[in-house]
Regions:
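Helix-loop "lid/cap" segments that line or gate small-molecule binding pockets
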Residues: 165-166, 217, 221, 236-241
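Crotonase-fold acyl-CoA enzyme core
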Residues: 6, 95-211, 242-243, 247-251, ...
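Conserved CoA-thioester-binding segment of acyl-CoA-metabolizing enzymes
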Residues: 1-54, 95, 251
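Terminal peptide-recognition signature
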Residues: 17, 21, 35-36, 51, ...
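Hydrophobic alpha-helical membrane-association signature
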Residues: 32-36, 86-89, 192, 233
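Glycine- (often His-adjacent) and acidic-residue-rich active-site loop
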Residues: 45, 53-96, 112, 142, ...
Length: 264
């Protein structure tokens, strides 16, 4: 499918989704949110997703120019417009990214700011170059974090660091982001693309049905009690144990060879 604000390409089992408004540092208007939603809802058999940004930024946030009030009525109606835009465009996109049934990798260079931070962190694995940084810029314009930040950040880095990011609006550069557990890994800028592509390919060639169940269990486990989590794991093990990949894994172990998983 052809898009205007993103590009999608398929390499083997990996769907690469690139935010493609480099002249705006890949700022995300509602149209981009809708196109991301559409792209990840129809994977067409892809077994992993790699998200990148074209040019020198991952995503500089929502496109304030596209969302600006041109009516002259001022900020009062702005809150209503923001609510409607979030509910119609940005929240469905973030929910879709978080619900992708296969592994998602994001590769961050330059800013991942505002909703761009949420887009990046919605991935299962976030790799940043040393130039990459994560910014909750909302406080600088008198707004509150959105895009699921209030849910994601405390769970990733704890309430102290989440409060710092949201209330102080400080940039968290790649190396610090790795150190505090915000992201998976920070690498040299020139290694970012290769590292992210290699990880996405490795995941895509793995037992992606089981990986999808792991994703489900991790998310659900954040909200479930211990007993419910044990049951959920047992149910997942039953489902995974009936898969072709499980049979292939057992046979490859017995035959002392590398498994050839199919994601089924």
């Amino acid at each position: 499918m052809s898009y205007e604000t993103i590009t999608t390409t398929r390499t083997g089992n990996v769907l690469k989704l690139t935010l493609n408004r480099p002249e705006r540092l890949n700022a995300c208007p509602p149209q981009m949110a809708d196109e991301i939603f559409d792209a990840v809802r129809d994977l067409d058999g892809a077994r992993a997703v790699l998200m990148t940004g074209e040019g020198r930024a991952f995503c500089s946030g929502a496109d304030l120019a596209a969302n600006a009030d041109k009516s002259g009525t001022g900020p009062i109606n702005g809150g209503d417009r923001a609510f409607t835009s979030l509910q119609r465009h940005y929240n469905p996109m973030i929910q879709a990214l978080a619900s992708v049934p296969v592994p998602v990798v994001s590769a961050v260079q330059g800013p991942a700011a505002g909703v761009g931070c949420s887009i990046a962190l919605a991935a299962d694995f976030v790799i940043a170059g040393k130039s990459g940084y994560f910014l909750q810029a909302f406080v600088n314009i008198g707004l509150v974090p959105d895009g699921g930040s209030s849910w994601m950040l405390p769970r990733l880095v704890g309430t102290a660091q989440a409060t710092r990011m949201m209330m102080l609006g400080e940039k968290i550069h790649g190396e610090e982001a790795e150190r505090i557990g915000l992201i998976y890994k920070c690498v040299e800028d020139e290694a970012l693309t290769a590292e992210a592509e290699a990880l996405a390919e490795k995941l895509a060639n793995g037992p992606t049905l089981a990986l999808g169940l792991m994703k489900r269990n991790i998310r659900a486990g954040l909200e479930s009690d211990f007993t419910a989590t044990l049951l959920m794991e047992a149910q997942g093990q039953r489902e995974a144990g009936m898969s072709q990949d499980s049979m292939e894994g057992a046979m490859s172990f017995l035959q002392k060879r590398k498994p050839a998983f199919k994601g089924a």
